Amino acid sequence: MPSNMNNKLDPVFSSGFVRREFNDSGIADGKLRTISTSSCATTMSSESYRISLGVGPLWWSDVPVHHRTDHDRASLLTGYSRKSSVDSAGGSLYEASSRASSLSSSQSDCSDLESQPDIHSLCSDDDCQEVLRQILQHDQPVQITIKLHVTEDQYTNWNTILNPVNNLLYVALPKDLPPAGSKQTFISLLEFAEEKLEVDGIVMVMPKDQPDRARLIEAFLFMGFEPLSRKAPQAPPAAINDNENYYFLYSIEE
C-alpha cells in the first residue's frame, strides 16, 4: 500500500479549471482550453486517455493472459484509448465526475474497450509500458479516465487530471461506488498513481452530498489522506469559491 508523508507541492490550476463532458462510452470529446496559475499559464494537453485497470497489487504479470488466475486477470491493464481532443467547455472537472461514474454488467474489459474504434488492446508488458510512456511524456496537464474493475463485470470510471507541473494527480470521487470491493479498488488507484504515474501526491475531491460520506472520510483519513484547505497551494484556486466539495491530500513518500 502506498506510503505518505508531508511534501511541499506547487500551486497549479486557476478558476479556469477544466470540466470533461463524457459520451455514453465515457470517452471525452471536444475542445481545448487554457488553465493557469496566478503567475503563469498552463495549457491542457490536446490528448486524453482512458485506461482499464483491475483490482489487485500486480498491475502486469508475465503470466500469459489466458493462463491467469482470476486475481491475476483482474490486475492486468488490458486496454486503453487515446483521444486527440478534450472537452473543457466550462465548469470544473469535479462536476463531470458523477456523470462519468458508472457501474456496468459488460463483458471483460478487453472486449468492452475493443468495442470503441480508437481502442488498443494490451496483452504484453511492453504494450503497458508504452501506454505509460505516452502519458508521462506530456509536459502539460493531461486528462485520464481510469476504469477500475471491482470484478471483471463491474467497474467505476474515475475522472482524473495528471499535472506534470506539480506532479499531482487530481481525482474526482465518483458518486456511485459499488459496496463490494470499493476499498480495494481505491487502494488500486493509489498504487497505480504512486508506482506507475510516480506522482508526488493525490488531491481527492469529494462532493459534500456524497452517499455514505462519513464512512468514506473515515476511510480516507485511515489511509493517510489529510483534509486540504480550499486556500492551500495544492488545491486548484477555483476551490476558494467552491462550497460543494471537500478536498483531501495524499502525499507520497519518495
From Swiss-Prot:
InterPro entries: Acyl_CoA_acyltransferase, ODC_AZ, ODC_AZ_sf
GO cellular component: cytoplasm; cytosol; nucleoplasm; nucleus
BP-aspect Gene Ontology terms: positive regulation of protein catabolic process; viral translational frameshifting
Native organism: Drosophila melanogaster (Fruit fly)
UniProt entry tagged with the keyword Repeat: no
Annotated gene: Oda
Quaternary structure annotation from Swiss-Prot or TrEMBL: Interacts with ODC1 and thereby sterically blocks ODC homodimerization.
Protein name: Ornithine decarboxylase antizyme
Keyword entries, A-Z: Developmental protein
